């Protein structure tokens, strides 16, 4: 068996095209373009790359993109004041604070300061809570994008045994909630899990998000499983690999995401969807 490769770039492009078409429709109706404010604190190289891709995606779909690049020494108070200002700006539908923040910043306080109806990253406790209660509003972008990829395979999720490896607030925990909502029997593995191999071998649907290169041996993959690899790790030779041993895993799985070109593009595409949704669902009537 050789797995079908899930082309995240292609699926993401389809989503961006759909968003762009809806933006053009809005403009034709005399409505404004959705607006996204992106805040970057400091000069972390990886964060700069991610922010750049988000800003380019905004331009591609026709959003108004606003950039706020703060010095690494910017105080918590300065950052909160900027968020307060953007919360009240009627032309801003989404506010994104690029993580990680410098050590002196209180990330929880920052994320909670963003109005839930402008929380297009889906990290505010209100939005995570809605997902947990099966009434999702603005959903965390990476898990949302993963669900879109799974839907693109045509695989029916009801009754599948899903295993999530990694329990971060950004991916693992909300991913577990998404899979429960999709009808899976879901297991979440983390650093205290003692029988990781046994859990992985039982997975009909495996999502791995730990940030460790080739952490899951390909031999562990259940024959016919659907494998979603969220990790993106740079090796000493400069090559990029995921958290799953790809070449071996693809001989066991039915579907697998590549690294790069799998989950990454979907995160940005989901951000575009969320920003459009925030504009249409929450802010159009407030104009």
From Swiss-Prot:
> Does the keyword Oxidoreductase belong to this entry?
yes
Keywords, in A-Z order: Amino-acid biosynthesis, Histidine biosynthesis, Hydrolase, Methionine biosynthesis, Multifunctional enzyme, NADP, One-carbon metabolism, Oxidoreductase, Purine biosynthesis
Q: One GO term of the cellular component aspect?
A: cytosol
InterPro entries given in the database record:
Aminoacid_DH-like_N_sf, NAD(P)-bd_dom_sf, THF_DH/CycHdrlase, THF_DH/CycHdrlase_cat_dom, THF_DH/CycHdrlase_CS, THF_DH/CycHdrlase_NAD-bd_dom
User: Which pathway does this chain act in?
Assistant: One-carbon metabolism; tetrahydrofolate interconversion
Give any single GO term for biological process. Answer: methionine biosynthetic process
> According to its UniProt record, which reaction does this protein catalyse?
(6R)-5,10-methylene-5,6,7,8-tetrahydrofolate + NADP(+) = (6R)-5,10-methenyltetrahydrofolate + NADPH; (6R)-5,10-methenyltetrahydrofolate + H2O = (6R)-10-formyltetrahydrofolate + H(+)
GO MF annotations in UniProt: methenyltetrahydrofolate cyclohydrolase activity; methylenetetrahydrofolate dehydrogenase (NADP+) activity
Q: Does the keyword Oxidoreductase apply?
A: yes
Instruction: State the source organism's domain of life.
Output: Bacteria
Q: One of this protein's Pfam families, by short name?
A: THF_DHG_CYH
Q: What is its EC number?
A: 1.5.1.5, 3.5.4.9
* Residue positions binding NADP(+): 166-168, 232
Could you give the subunit structure recorded for this chain?
Answer: Homodimer.
The protein's job, in short, is: Catalyzes the oxidation of 5,10-methylenetetrahydrofolate to 5,10-methenyltetrahydrofolate and then the hydrolysis of 5,10-methenyltetrahydrofolate to 10-formyltetrahydrofolate.
Q: Tell me the HAMAP family matching this sequence.
A: THF_DHG_CYH (MF_01576)
What protein family is recorded? Answer: Belongs to the tetrahydrofolate dehydrogenase/cyclohydrolase family.
The protein's name is Bifunctional protein FolD
**This protein's encoding gene:** folD
